[in-house]
Amino acid sequence: TGGTYYLHVLTVDNTENKKEVISERIVITSVPKNWKKTTSNDPEWYDYGTEVNAPKLGTGMTPIVYEGANKPTEKKWANAITEDGSMWVWIPRYAYSITSGYHSSSTGTIEIKFLKESSNVAYDGTSTWDNVSGQGKWNIHPAFNYGQEVSGIWVAKFEASPEGATTSTSNSEYNGTGKKLQVKPGVSSWRSITISNIYDVCKNYNSALNSHMMKNDEWGAVAYLSKSKYGKQNEEVWINNSSNHITGSAGNSASASQDTGTTTDYTSTQGVKASTTGTVYGVYDMSGGAHEYVAAYVNGENNRLIIYGKALINGETKTKNVYEKASRDYYED
């Protein structure tokens, strides 16, 4: 069983002298069901279908591979766990182009070119980018900057929940910073918490890993990659329609009404359709689930920003996206 342990050894010699030794802290990570630990040089760890930046494992992170039913052979985004058993997915640095459907209500298409390390040079050799809005324009995705350019980002595989969460919604309704978050399937996600407290809880999770509340552009980076040929592409991510907000759940269609045909088995044939890849290796809960907030706001001096998002407003620039108020935005209260 995963947890923190200490080895306690008591020895007694021939003259009955006793010696007691207590070891340093030993952390045993609980591996999710149907997954196993692996190494960073395991060729089975990930496969994006093309060359990408190797995932950067932070302190306490361990690569994992899936060993259960519906084991895919492609669209395997890298997965890892932290010491508490939380699950994370690697999004490699890339540039993108919206090739159809730009500023349209119709389903569009997105092309992706993965970039080498923290540079702006693609693996196919492309090094010149438009970096302006518009259909067919190529842009370096802004999510890959956290105070400096980065080679990729780790994102939560499921909606966050408080440690000790169960399938009971009451256990996951907490508006405070006294609990630690986790990222696990099959439990009710964290709700009834202010944006300011979300910001602090995420920052407090693991400072060594630069944990933070997901920014708007980081959420977008996951969505855009899912829409490319390296994700579900032309098939919509199915909705998590669980009324109890059970992480990793899936309805029986992309737009299923609440609790209609819901499965809580994210590894099942139906469950993987709610993943960004259509396989067990993707990110879940991107559609449906609980209401989600990102670390972003319009800088319009709205009083509610101060009331509910003080920590976010006072946070470091790299931890948030701030947008300027448009000339027609007159809302002050």
Label every PLM stretch briefly:
Residues T1-T4:
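Surface-exposed, short loops/turns at beta-strand junctions within beta-sandwich domains
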Residues Y6-V12:
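Extracellular recognition modules
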Residues N14, Y94-S97, F158-P162, A296-N299:
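Acidic glycine-/aspartate-rich tracts in secreted/extracellular proteins
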Residues T15-S30:
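Extracellular fibronectin type III
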Residues T29-G136:
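N-terminal module-boundary/linker segments of secreted carbohydrate-active enzymes
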Residues D84-G85, T107, E117-M286:
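Short aromatic-cysteine micro-motif
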Residues M87-V89, R93-A95, L209-A221, Q258-D333:
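Short, conserved beta-strand/loop elements in beta-sheet-dominated catalytic cores
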